[in-house]
A protein has these predicted regions:
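Conserved active-site tyrosine of GNAT-family acetyltransferases
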Residues: 26-30, 92, 121
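Short beta->alpha transition motifs characteristic of CBS
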Residues: 16, 107, 115, 127-130
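Core segments of cupin and vicinal oxygen chelate
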Residues: 10, 17-58
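Active-site beta-strand termini and strand-to-loop segments that position acidic
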Residues: 51-55, 116-119, 129
Length: 130
């Protein structure tokens, strides 16, 4: 009888989905702030933007489909802000996002975080060591 221990996992997250009402606007926003290329895919019932996943442990997807509603409430995901999240944070407002919490030191001094609303109204965090 094989048991599954979560302590054996390399990451507790495998996929995250960010809801969008306008897939092109959302893809443009994340491409601009993260300086990445997001692959767009369209299906009859949904549109997707897939974050680069090669070499990543986690897959990120922007989703426009029934049942996907952008929200500033609920779970907050924190994107990797690289060495210094301020570089990404400086691009937020120029790309129709809104900074909610500026770069701040974590209470336990384990690094820095910031929180913003994306182009769709989702609350998203950034985290970095510096």
């Amino acid at each position: 009888n094989e048991t599954h221990k979560t302590s054996d996992m390399k990451s507790f997250i495998s996929i995250f989905e960010i809801p969008a009402t306008d897939i092109s606007r959302a893809v443009d926003f994340y491409q601009a702030i993260l300086d990445i290329n997001i692959e767009k895919m369209e299906f009859p019932e949904m549109q997707m933007g897939i974050f680069p996943y090669e070499g990543q442990m986690i897959t990120g997807v922007i989703m426009k489909a029934e049942g996907y509603k952008p929200s500033a409430e609920g779970v907050t995901i924190y994107l990797n802000g690289g060495d210094n999240l301020q570089i990404i944070l400086d691009k937020i407002e120029d790309n129709d996002g809104k900074i909610i919490v500026p770069k701040s030191l974590h209470a336990d001094e384990s690094g820095y975080y910031a929180i913003f609303l994306d182009s769709e109204g989702n609350k998203i965090g950034l985290h970095s060591p510096n």
